[in-house]
């Protein structure tokens, strides 16, 4: 039976990793107020504060994972937590648009340090027999934190003011830091290497071009094509350098590909939904923010239930069928959600939110565990960074598509909100197809070796 230290370490890592999705979604319910403070329409404010957060996060994931391989996952995690606290304090103490944008960038960069290195710590610090359970709880925590973010943000905004959303991060991060410092083992064996700055800059330009191509009232094909070309050049470069920021050979493992696709397209739908709902009910139904946050509790609780169930289902019916079943439940939940015309109050969509939350919580953990176990332990940082990159890229793309469909007017219409649903369906279809890349049994894949 795992010792007490192991469970305390797991608790610290989970608290740390939850900060990243909380930072991106806790302001969802408060966006109308924040947009008014910034004197912008809600769509533009969402792109700047949420899309920008996700953009910086996704750019930093792979380099941060590589940095953790070099300096140690604990040190990288400590740096991330410290910067996250500093950015949160700035956002709370200084009430200006410029400082708010700077603090969000700091929090985004910090979240990029936190997530891959938290995941890598699970891979390297916990017994291998405990990993499926640990990644199940890890995935459930990330999903639940993203879903509970609007609930927490709504309550803080209702009873205090929107800057209180940032203050809560400080004691949260301090508790996580204390648990990890006390319980983690030193990372004795570190890989000798360096962070390739040229590759890092190239990756930043590639992802930045892709993201910026979806900002505005229409897609900028020049930026999108430029981003694809730069990303292709980045991959070509990584296959030829001695110390890649991310090793594309990981995608030789079908389980890793499935983990990446499930993470990316699952987050595409989840993030867009979390930010669509407050805008829909405020603009179209004139509902108070606190009522919207309360309805999202259904998604939160079902995600928390789906995570642990993932490991159980994986043992009983295998990884492939667990992931496939979860994808089908998710699609059925979306079918129920598509009847937005009948949703007069947030409580009307509790059932579809609960189904989609449970399905998301059930699919992600078992697939991520399979993907991480397919990669050598000493490359856990890079592997986790790659999956985190796909997670945030999916979320950022979801936010961008949502903003494109809702337009730049000060208020939105029912028809605009309905026009987003086919994009959700397409994303969930890719999640379903990814399940067929997984092995039927839950035996881990053989880790890849260097070519």
What would you call each of these model-derived segments?
Residues 87, 103, 110, 176, ...:
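Small-residue hotspots
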Residues 447-451:
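Short, intrinsically disordered terminal tails adjacent to the first/last structured region
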Residues 59, 113, 205-208, 272, ...:
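Residue-level signal for the membrane-embedded core of alpha-helical transmembrane segments
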Residues 90, 175-183, 209-212, 230-237, ...:
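Residue-level signal for alpha-helical transmembrane segments in multi-pass membrane proteins
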Residues 158-262, 269, 288, 294-295, ...:
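Hydrophobic transmembrane-helix bundles of small-molecule transporters
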Residues 6-22, 27-29, 50, 243-445:
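12-transmembrane solute porter fold
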Residues 1-182, 309, 316-317, 324-331, ...:
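Transmembrane-helix bundle of Major Facilitator Superfamily
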């Amino acid at each position: 039976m795992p010792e007490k230290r192991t469970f305390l370490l797991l608790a610290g890592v989970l608290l740390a990793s939850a900060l990243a999705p909380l930072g991106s979604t806790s302001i969802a319910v408060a966006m109308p107020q924040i947009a008014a403070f910034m004197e912008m329409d809600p769509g533009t404010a969402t792109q700047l504060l949420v899309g920008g957060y996700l953009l910086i996060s996704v750019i930093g994931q792979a380099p941060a994972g590589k940095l953790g391989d070099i300096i140690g996952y604990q040190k990288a995690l400590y740096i991330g937590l410290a910067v996250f606290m500093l950015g949160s304090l700035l956002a709370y103490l200084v009430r200006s648009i410029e400082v708010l944008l700077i603090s969000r960038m700091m929090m985004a960069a910090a979240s990029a340090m936190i997530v891959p290195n938290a995941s890598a710590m699970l891979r390297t610090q916990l017994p291998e027999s405990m990993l499926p359970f640990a990644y199940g709880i890890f995935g459930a925590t990330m999903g639940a934190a993203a879903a509970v973010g609007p609930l927490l943000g709504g309550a803080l905004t209702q009873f205090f003011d929107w800057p209180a959303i940032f203050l809560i991060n400080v004691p949260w991060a301090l508790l996580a830091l204390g648990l990890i410092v006390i319980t983690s083992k030193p990372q004795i064996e570190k890989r000798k290497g360096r962070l390739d700055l040229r590759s890092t800059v190239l990756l930043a330009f590639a992802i930045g071009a892709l993201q910026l191509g979806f900002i505005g009232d229409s897609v900028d094909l020049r930026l999108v094509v430029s981003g694809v070309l730069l990303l292709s050049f980045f991959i070509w470069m990584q296959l030829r350098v001695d110390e890649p920021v991310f090793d594309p050979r990981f995608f030789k493992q079908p389980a890793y590909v499935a983990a990446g696709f499930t993470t990316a397209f699952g987050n595409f739908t989840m993030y867009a939904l979390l930010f669509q709902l407050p805008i829909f009910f405020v603009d179209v139904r004139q509902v108070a923010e606190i009522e919207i946050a309360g309805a999202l509790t259904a998604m939160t609780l079902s995600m928390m239930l789906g995570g642990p169930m993932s490991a159980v289902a994986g043992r009983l019916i295998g990884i492939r069928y667990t992931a496939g079943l979860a994808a089908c439940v998710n699609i059925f939940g979306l079918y129920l959600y598509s009847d937005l015309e009948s949703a007069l109050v947030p409580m009307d969509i509790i059932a579809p939110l609960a189904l989609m939350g449970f399905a998301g919580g059930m699919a992600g953990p078992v697939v991520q565990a399979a993907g991480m176990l397919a990669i050598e332990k000493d490359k856990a940082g890079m592997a986790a960074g790659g999956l985190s990159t796909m997670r945030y890229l999916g979320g950022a793309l979801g936010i961008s598509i949502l903003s494109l469909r809702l337009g730049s007017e000060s208020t939105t219409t029912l028809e605009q909100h309905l026009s987003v649903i086919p994009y959700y369906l397409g994303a969930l279809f890719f999640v379903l197809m990814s399940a067929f890349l997984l092995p039927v049994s839950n035996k881990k894949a053989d880790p890849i070796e260097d070519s």
